[in-house]
Amino acid sequence: MKKTEGKPLPFGATIQKDKVNFAVPVPEGKEAALLLYRVGEETPCMSWPLEDSVGEVRCLALEGCDPAEYEYNYEIDGEIVPDAYARAYAGKEVWGKETKASDHTLRCKLYDEPYDWEGDKQLHIPYHKVIAYALHVRGFTQDASSKVAHRGTFQGIVEKLPYIKELGVNQIQCMPVYEFEECTESHLNYWGYGKAYYFAPKSAYAADGNGIKGLKDMVKACHKEGIEVVLEMPFSSEVPGQVIGECLRYYMMEYHIDGFILNPMLISIESVSADPILKTTKIMQHREDFQGTMRRFLKGDEGMMEAVTYWLRHLSEEDHIFNYITSHTGFTLKDLVSYDEKHNEENGENNQDGPDYNNSWNCGIEGPTRKKSILSLRKTQMKNAFFLLLLSQGTPCILAGDEFGNSQKGNNNVYCQDNAVSWLNWSQLSKEKELHDFVKVLIALRKEYPLLYPEKEMTGADRTGRGVPDVSYHGEEAWRAPFERTSRQLGVYYSAATREEEECFIAYNMHWTKHDFALPILSKGKNWYLRASTQDGVLTEPSLLKEQKKVELPPRTVMFITGR
């Protein structure tokens, strides 16, 4: 093995034809060395001083260094440290096992592994056609009830792809899959937030410990089923914007990732979106405006009409957002309708952690109950929540497990819970089959009507010259929106571009009393048909309404009507 002059870029270990280049930032005046280990050994077999520098980057190249035979770390100012730019790490293959570079149990791998993508590419599903599904790689299948062979892994997700595809989803959003430290001084880091090794997929998320191949296999399998893969990348505040951009480009090019969810407080979403390499990659952010508005409307708060009308029609792409009523940071949907207060006692922080204001409503009793009237109301509210999410025109995202009533027992902050509290309980699927099937056909219904996912945001103007605005709002009187503060009901009419196409009218009654809705008069030859409602579910065939001028909605009911 021979030491030669190295290059300062790219950072990390770069395998070339006959040598490996090492480049690492080192503060000025600090001594640094490269440590080499035989694969699997915890004692360095060689040490090479890092003397050449460009700025504060030390670099060297080693001719004759076989990537299959060696692992490495750095020694900087007397401290053993891993390479933050490494593509894979040894010692992290087992979830929950504490390893560290200081005792050589954590080492960097020299990645040089060809992969056959079989012609795979990013899917580029149009933003307005996306139906997203948010999950935690481990929590999605770790529970024995998942009945997969490789629980809590990328492979577990692949085993569940038939389920995901049948549901109607075409994008999965994964919580952090990079190599984070799950064992911290204060708590278990289940979610993966905080400092991490961002360039390396998590080894413990692969059944065989090979996170690189595991993530690639999952992405390729998802793409074959027409499902995009989006990664949440909540970089810590210490990571420079330049490194964030480099990391995102790496995952897009090396792993064919379709999109990223970023923290706009740390990096400009607009600047990342303008990156020439990432120009056609979805760059997104969490925003809770839709969530807060629809939760309050769902439970019957007053004064919500203006916000509701905006979020029913607002498209997501321009703002780099997506609509959700529940997410990992808060209650599941089942808990949203079952608890008024958070119950985070198991987190060990005296119930002081997690959001205090959840805009939830327990329907009359806190937590589990056998009272049939309460259970029926909760089921109604969950269906209404899915109506609000899937019939809004922005891009919807379902929290994994909500479609079958998964519960976290009132815990709205499971960041440290790696157990049955945070894992999906798949046994609920058979118990809540009716809810699951309702969600599945509601997703199919959304896809059936392009008026529910337009390419351009509707404005209330007559764009087609038919004399009818593209979107209008109605109440007990047609063309008169009930915008009074006490109103908890709204009719929304989406007009078709041509006389031949179907019209859509959605009546939302979140009030605890019944309300009449006046129906706009259709063009000659068309009639109003019931297509779906909270009570009836999604009808296999549209049912002609006996009354064509108005419709009565029971309390807490949504009705979807089409004009044809």
Residue ranges: model-predicted function:
Residues 128-147, 194, 232, 362:
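N-terminal small/glycine-rich loop or linker at the start of catalytic domains
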Residues 138-172:
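A conserved hydrophobic secondary-structure block that centers on an alpha-helix together
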Residues 165-186, 330, 340-342:
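Carboxylate/His-rich catalytic cores and anion/metal-binding grooves
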Residues 223-228, 233-288:
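Active-site neighborhood of glycoside hydrolase catalytic domains
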